[in-house]
């Protein structure tokens, strides 16, 4: 419940910043792509209430990586406000509703990819870099292709949000998520390698870290 309350509180604050950036609710409903974006946001929020992710330190945690959460928080608040604001004032925007629709599609696809692993892992999915009780290495399904699908979904989701508001600032903000995500992945994989030893090494040898075929 604590995790759900935090998600809800952050969601409310982010929604408020987006509305503030757009100058009210009316401008959002004047653009069909943004109306579709609002529907997708609502669907993803509802879906998140059925997840079992947590913020537990579990049996062992790398507390030195908690700074990444603070960076994510600041970046996400900027993502909530700046793309909407630059869209409203026409600063560094990309012309055309087609880019908005592309953004909506990417936002939805990224959101699904972000949330899918949370459902797969259940209570083993933590917002912290930690080993949970009964932790097991999942190597099938989407994890048989890439080791960090949720983070790839996070990047795609954030990029889609920026494009839905035609915002180049939003695109840059999405790119700024990559360094802390890579730092987070390295910390997580170091812990998994310590926990599962040769099993994780064999798994990492046959899969990509984040982007199939590239990285």
Residue ranges of each PLM-predicted region?
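Membrane-anchoring alpha-helices and their flanking helix-loop junctions
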Residues: 1-132, 160-215
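Active-site-proximal inter-transmembrane loops
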Residues: 128-153
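PRPP/pyrophosphate-binding module of the type I phosphoribosyltransferase fold
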Residues: 155-157
